[in-house]
Amino acid sequence: MEQLSVNRRQFQILLQQINMTDDTFMTYFEHGEIKKLTIHKASKSWHFHFQFKSLLPFQIYDTLTTRLTQSFAHIAKVTSSIEVQDAEVSESIVQDYWSRCIEELQGISPPIISLLNQQKPKLKGNKLIVKTKTDTEAAALKNKYSSMIQAEYRQFGFPDLQLDAEIFVSEQEVQKFREQKLAEDQERAMQALIEMEKKDKESDEDQAPSGPLVIGYQIKDNEEIRTLDSIMDEERRITVQGYVFDVETRELKSGRTLCIFKITDYTNSILIKMFAREKEDAALMKSLKKGMWVKARGSIQNDTFVRDLVMIANDVNEIKAKTREDSAPEGEKRVELHLHSPMSQMDAVTGIGKLVEQAKKWGHEAIALTDHAVVQSFPDAYSAAKKHGIKMIYGMEANLVDDGVPIAYNAAHRLLEEETYVVFDVETTGLSAVYDTIIELAAVKVKGGEIIDKFEAFANPHRPLSATIIELTGITDDMLQDAPDVVDVIRDFREWIGDDILVAHNASFDMGFLNVAYKKLLEVEKAKNPVIDTLELGRFLYPEFKNHRLNTLCKKFDIELTQHHRAIYDTEATAYLLLKMLKDAAEKGIQYHDELNENMGQSNAYQRSRPYHATLLAVNSTGLKNLFKLVSLSHIHYFYRVPRIPRSQLEKYREGLLIGSACDRGEVFEGMMQKSPEEVEDIASFYDYLEVQPPEVYRHLLELELVRDEKALKEIIANITKLGEKLNKPVVATGNVHYLNDEDKIYRKILISSQGGANPLNRHELPKVHFRTTDEMLEAFSFLGEEKAKEIVVTNTQKVASLVDDIKPIKDDLYTPKIEGADEEIREMSYQRARSIYGEELPEIVEARIEKELKSIIGHGFAVIYLISHKLVKRSLDDGYLVGSRGSVGSSLVATLTEITEVNPLPPHYVCPECQHSEFFNDGSVGSGFDLPDKTCPHCGTPLKKDGHDIPFETFLGFKGDKVPDIDLNFSGEYQPQAHNYTKVLFGEDNVYRAGTIGTVAEKTAYGYVKGYAGDNNLHMRGAEIDRLVQGCTGVKRTTGQHPGGIIVVPDYMDIYDFSPIQFPADATGSEWKTTHFDFHSIHDNLLKLDILGHDDPTVIRMLQDLSGIDPKTIPTDDPEVMKIFQGTESLGVTEEQIGCKTGTLGIPEFGTRFVRQMLEDTKPTTFSELVQISGLSHGTDVWLGNAQELIHNNICELSEVIGCRDDIMVYLIYQGLEPSLAFKIMEFVRKGKGLTPEWEEEMKNNNVPDWYIDSCKKIKYMFPKAHAAAYVLMAVRIAYFKVHHALLYYAAYFTVRADDFDIDTMIKGSTAIRAVMEDINAKGLDASPKEKNLLTVLELALEMCERGYSFQKVDLYRSSATEFIIDGNSLIPPFNSIPGLGTNAALNIVKAREEGEFLSKEDLQKRGKVSKTILEYLDRHGCLESLPDQNQLSLF
């Protein structure tokens, strides 16, 4: 029996070492044990013999064996076998293990392996039935391979299973197969002979292997290469090639090496498996890396494990990567001035680092970054440019809007109610006033509220109409065949309108066509008539409407619109709409035509303007700061669907910026498509340079019929270059880059597709916007002639780049706030508090420590950080909430004396609160002052206070005391918002911001996008192709957010725009806080970040204080009954069988998890310092598992002696006699996992540091600070005190603050019901949902509470709180928000309604309490509404 417990304990230790102690695993490992461990020293191999109660699910088995192999790979090669007590075998579990069984087999011919891989066996009794093609195969399987398969299954824990075979193919097929295989084998034999001769020759010449990677045999250059999209089914011996985007090498239990990698040739992707045939292969496989291009030769098979077609490769050869070159001569390379990174939200996919690297490889001197409306890639761009030695131009593609769109044109002082109006509409062949023509012009004259005349005419365009125009307007070619020419129609219309006021819906369009026709056809000036645009007038009068389209407005005002998009019907409807609008305008005091534009730029006018794209490039540091200001304005004050920059603001902050005309969504290109040359010239004069892009980039405009044909498109581009010449503005050719290579476009397509109709880019085929070489760009613009192409592609882009300075968007130094007198205040506060504790004549150890710390703190300008932290903590303490410290701030005595932390870092000591007598223990004999025995003052008889944790200051600010202090504070979660707002009081609202974060597309989300895209387009994708596409879509910006506790402080001698733009988190313009636009990590070293975190522990402590009246600071830290819960359950009055736990620490912070509870079982701590050790051990990496755990288990040392926290190392080594500076150095190296140098080991040995201690140091990877551990344990001990001595108060606080998921129905029923639900959840294992796992923790505490003699009542309509569990005798009344589906707001509504008066009926409760029918039924079903009638009763008296 004792041996059994040892075996199980060893297995539990092993599980901790391989990190498999989660509840999801432990369900299967409950009765597991290590029966034997066989060790072969010569071969460095270990074999574990496990025993389990039942067969492990394959997923669990696979995880166990993988972690075993990985965990001990540096020590030995690990294998294992399993013995099962109750092996219940099903066909499904046999099939789950099948692929692993086949992988592990050795010495089986490839055809048989292929045959077995293509199927899963059937189970009949104890027989595995597989299908074969021939008698020979069947005989081989039964006679030769059956025992091998049986042995493999036995290793997994299965009973003996016999293999049987059924034949299902003809002998003819087999013969054909044999002949084919014979031919292949002969060819491979010949090739093997050639390779052997080649190797022998190389060996004779004593040449070292070099050159590209070759695994297996060389693949000939002339061998046919199959594209991956052509592979549709299983095939024998084909060759493919592609880019390796994922690779994994693993050693199988059999000793063979398996290499699994995925390649793509951008037509598709495939997973390739290759088994090493010899040691040389295995070594070479490790050289196969992601990013290589390879050829692979092998067979295509259906893999039952991955359920997909895969290649089983025999040969893999590295080949030269396919890359594009920029062959333009040095000095004649282009500069890309329009480029997007993944910070262009859900639109661009290639990281800025890769784009910069490519530009450098091509020999480009500079590159510009111009993300959509943001500058969040600037920090990464700066790093990449510095790394690759290339000039970075920092810019942005802005959404430019006019401050207000005119309602009236050609303003005239004419009384609106007396005027005659011509309401007109044109139908056209397209949208371009320059390249398209009018096909219908209709108008009505309105005077005195009535239509007095009509004009209607078709015009012959002398070219066929497009299908789109016919569908949109209902006008056909036949209807226009006999119509007059446009010139005649325009002439007649001009005469008919006279000088009346013209009215149109979206007048800029109609007037554009009219004015071009006037000039082009009649050769007269554009119309001088006053104009009213009913679209803009509608936006001004009815801003609450979602849109202001003609049909929308007509529907709103019950105006009949018979046939929309036919001119005559549109004009009549617009006429009646005008009459309504003029009446509403008059009510706003608008009487004259020239008053219509008076409100143009006011209020939300920026929302009514359509945004145009414009490129902004920062020329110098002034420009950079102005760019930051514009980004901030666009996100804070002018955000409407997208961040917008009003033209007036751009003019205001234009200094230091170059403004480019951007893409087809810029106003210059659109103007050249649709407006007269004079108008475009006027528009272009605003810009510093004009942009044109390759015709391919504008291809969607042809699809959308915005441009008639390729010829018209090239004419527009040519006209922009001519306009640049005329205005003496450089015209530059840009690529509008969204990804690196053309094959990357699929990633962008998937991201845009995921946004559905919300993204207008989904309405057309996406253009090709890869990063183009100089040659590609020159070719794209060759239609302009060689000289002009070179000018816009090379000369002008270099010219613009030369205008830009080298700019640093990120600063080098830290800029902390300044508070007058901070140094003196911290010094005075420290000494005042020290003297109040230790007396006017401070003990030398105290004064020396204070002076040492103040020298560093004040000397390096850190006093202000201490003072700020002090003010924040003091405010919280004054408001009744304790604050817990995190990190190593408790290493600073000054932090203790200024009340930033409760942790006292001095050596353990007594101090008298009455006469200040003190006694210090600075020899290392005591771990914590809290562990000293109680003692009275020898001078005055007062009980002495015990304190001190012996933590060196160096662990906080470094040995020289010059490390920037990182003070993290745990405030109560419910007090955190007040602490945040207090920083506004301390520094001013314009000097504090929440630390910004950027949320990118995660792997799971990308997987959803890829699957959605495949489904929408009826694509069947192989798993490898899905993986490739997922990789390409991850990391793209999806949203922004804020750090949960980080507050960035800008000193008052700087402003935020010196460091970062600002915005609202997730562009939520109603947010209380603004955030930094940059991710806070980017400016972490430039500005002070206060970590004001929200934590449950202070909230629990506050609730317990309120319930009990006990000041938590008076709670003893060495209460014997409290200490017992860390060893057992005795002080709770229950047995471990009752609560299913061997300790009493369920629900105690830091000590309630299964992993730490196991540590407690192993170590049985009895003191505060040992609890601190356990906290340090549990948070470190390789500090407990395989290290301290073994030292304690093997009785080499006690818990108190092992290395638990990083500070222990420095303190211990100083006590042993090492120089403090060396002790500090060793601590820093060890805590970062860097081990020890031979010199340090020698010095440690010279000072009698034991060998086990030195070995322990060498194993550690990461260590926890002792101050952090001490702060956590202090909170834990205080909460544990209530659990032991005030149980119901503890449970009320726990369930109120910490628990989120309840099953109140079960909890009310008591222990038996709770256990049953817990067993159900445990039985689900890995399949249990996150909600169920959270509920399990709550139920553990509920069970413990019930077993201690307490109970839960049902929710009470008149006594339940909204959110808190209420104590009633020996039971708890649950709050309303514990009811399933009832949130906190709904719970508060019920309580509010209850306070207003008693509920008369269920109907009254539902109405006043805003309770849903489901919640009402729940309350009724559980007897909470017994006294209430269904409906209100009317009384006659």
Swiss-Prot record:
Region listing for Contains the active site of the enzyme, in residue ranges: 1393-1437
Domain Exonuclease: 421-578
Effect seen on changing residue 1175 to A: In mutant AZP12
Gene3D superfamilies for the chain: 1.10.150.870, 3.30.1900.20, 6.10.140.1510, Metal-dependent hydrolases, Nucleic acid-binding proteins, PolC, middle finger domain, Ribonuclease H-like superfamily/Ribonuclease H
Pfam families (UniProt xref): DNA_pol3_a_NI, DNA_pol3_a_NII, DNA_pol3_alpha, DNA_pol3_finger, HHH_6, PHP, RNase_T, tRNA_anti-codon
Single GO BP term: DNA-templated DNA replication
Top class in the EC scheme: transferase
SUPFAM superfamilies the UniProt entry points to: Nucleic acid-binding proteins, Ribonuclease H-like
Keyword annotations: Antibiotic resistance, Cytoplasm, DNA replication, DNA-directed DNA polymerase, Exonuclease, Hydrolase, Nuclease, Nucleotidyltransferase, Transferase
Impact reported for residue 427 to Q: Destroys exonuclease activity; decreases polymerase activity
More about this protein: Mutant azp12 has a form of DNA polymerase III resistant to hydroxyphenylazopyrimidines.
Family affiliation: Belongs to the DNA polymerase type-C family. PolC subfamily.
Protein name: DNA polymerase III PolC-type
Name of the coding gene: polC
